[in-house]
Regions:
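A short, charged, amphipathic alpha-helix used as a generic interaction element across diverse proteins
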Residues: 115-118, 123-149
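Intrinsically disordered, low-complexity, charged/polar segments
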Residues: 57-98, 168
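A cross-kingdom feature marking charged/low-complexity
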Residues: 159-178
């Protein structure tokens, strides 16, 4: 297994934010339960730039299990082009931090992230337009293609190589503006 180091990171140090990024943990920090060094950071008071706290909350890209670690055990954020395909597939299954509980909220969208060869893992349910935007932002740097579909499986958003190709930029800006004005009230992505 490849051992990631500081040279594999695009950002290192305490001056960077870790939330919604793939981070590399020091090999010394790994427990027997988590054999890979790559984790998706969901938050914690140690995830902020120049943090006051030390705790970071993570999801393993080896097995999908949630865990916590200390900020000092994080080497940095991995360069997106170095993220292995297996880790990309695992990342595609992570819902955004703060996503609505699917036991009490009806999902409105499904998100799919594709590798360059077209492979993907099962889609993830997304409960609101804000969850869609959060999912796209967290996947965009790492995935070849991200596709968002509505409940009828019609494509409502597509991102290719980090660029939104559907809807147009103008339509997306109008949608985001209306979302800000309504703050969670009934806007439909088309």
């Amino acid at each position: 297994m490849y051992v990631f180091n500081r040279g594999d990171c695009d950002q290192t140090g305490y001056g960077i934010g870790l939330k919604n990024k793939v981070v590399v943990l020091s090999q010394n920090a790994l427990s027997k339960e988590h054999f890979g060094q790559l984790f998706f950071c969901t938050g914690g008071n140690g995830a902020n730039p120049n943090p006051m706290g030390r705790t970071v909350f993570l999801i393993s890209l080896s097995d999908g299990e949630a865990c916590r670690s200390e900020r000092g055990e994080v080497i940095g954020t991995v360069k997106p082009e170095l993220l292995p395909e297996e880790a990309k597939l695992q990342l595609s299954q992570i819902r955004p931090a703060g996503a609505a509980d699917l036991h009490t909220h009806e999902p409105e969208y499904s998100g799919y992230s594709f590798l360059e060869d077209g492979r993907y893992a099962a889609g993830v349910w997304l409960g609101s337009p804000q969850e869609v935007m959060d999912y796209v932002e967290m996947q965009k740097p790492y995935q070849h293609r991200v596709l968002i579909c509505d409940r009828d499986d019609f494509a409502v958003m597509e991102v290719l190589k980090g660029q939104v190709i559907f809807p147009t930029e103008k339509e997306l800006e109008a949608f985001q503006k209306s979302m800000q004005e309504q703050k969670g009230g009934g806007m439909e992505m088309k």
